A protein has these predicted regions:
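Exposed, low-structure sequence patches enriched in small/polar residues
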Residues: 1-240
């Protein structure tokens, strides 16, 4: 069992802390925030691995997560009329201008749980492996002057077969399926799925002459669109 904890602090930049307004472009203003605090991220990782060397079997389980306090985000305010800014010596922001400033936000975090298993199938001279995981993240951001929280959930599963029959043939088969669901405070959802399949086969026809075939397939589907599928097929053959 392996356990690790770490902490990281991010200090605001000097420009971010200056109580000054950049008005070189009167319609695109930017200013500092002297009340900005440093952000602190706390991370933890826990891993477990078990192996049976006599049977060449392995099992692993891991978890990692992090939370961030006072993350530094960018806030943007749009002015619908001429507006004085007392925090910047009373400068009057003209109608139609935007003001961009850094601010601290809370609520950022992420976590992931994963597991893996591998074992040989001696009767077929192949090794089977499976890996599964699920990740979740929550990220606060500003859309204009409105604080928005984006949540993302991403489970995935991958399987593989690897075979090696001495000098006769070598082959591998790999497949991965990943689903992603993203939602935010504005009730807009986005759901996608990615599927990939990759296979490789090398056969020794006669002495020192080999045929190698590689096939790759990928599928991307966006559930938000009726015609959101993207399919790709690639086949390569080599002789040597």
């Amino acid at each position: 069992i392996y356990v690790n904890y770490s902490s990281n602090a991010q200090q605001p930049g000097v420009e971010q802390l200056r109580n000054e307004l950049n008005y070189q472009n009167p319609l695109s203003l930017s200013g500092g925030n002297p009340d900005l605090k440093q952000s602190n991220m706390h991370s933890v990782y826990i891993g477990y691995t078990a192996a049976k060397t006599e049977k060449s079997r392995t099992f692993s389980l891991n978890f990692n997560g992090s939370v961030t306090a006072r993350e530094i985000a960018t806030k943007q305010v749009f002015f619908t009329e001429d507006t004085p800014l007392p925090e910047y010596n009373g400068y009057i922001a003209p109608k139609g201008a935007t003001l961009t400033t850094p601010v601290n936000v809370n609520g950022a975090g992420s976590m992931r749980l994963g597991a893996g298993y591998s074992l040989p199938v001696k009767a077929l001279d192949i090794t089977f492996s499976a890996n599964a995981g699920c990740a979740y993240s929550r990220r606060p951001t500003y859309i204009g002057d409105e604080l928005n929280y984006t949540n993302s959930l991403s489970p995935n599963l991958s399987l593989s077969l690897i075979g090696n029959k001495s000098l006769v043939y070598q082959f591998s088969l790999y497949t991965n399926t990943a689903y992603n669901r993203t939602s935010n405070s504005r009730k807009s959802d986005n759901n996608t799925i990615n599927q990939t399949v990759a296979t490789n086969l090398t056969v020794n026809i006669v002495k020192k002459i080999y045929v190698t075939a590689n096939y790759n397939y990928s599928l991307y589907h966006n559930f938000s669109y009726a015609d959101g599928d993207v399919n790709t097929h690639i086949l390569n053959l080599t002789f040597g």
